[in-house]
């Protein structure tokens, strides 16, 4: 996918290994139970996107924009959000907060990210290290 717009699109149980999303505007897109570990996102804008029960270990979202995005039960261990803009973004675990979830979310790198106060408070509340963050 290169320099396109994806609107109201759904990826269900998809294995998107080596798929490349370059300069894409994703609006109201749903990724459900998908393997995104080797998916590449570059220069994308995420608006109203939902990542539900996706395997996203080690993925890099560096320098991208997220507005009204939900990460519902998504495994983001060792992923990178360096220099991103986060507005009204939620990171929701399964119905129970487990030690595995706390350990996993603490491995996410938010260095240099800009985020609204609500997103900041939610991440800080689960113990994420938020140094070098800019509040919007």
What feature does the model see in each segment?
Residues 1-136:
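Tandem repeat scaffolds
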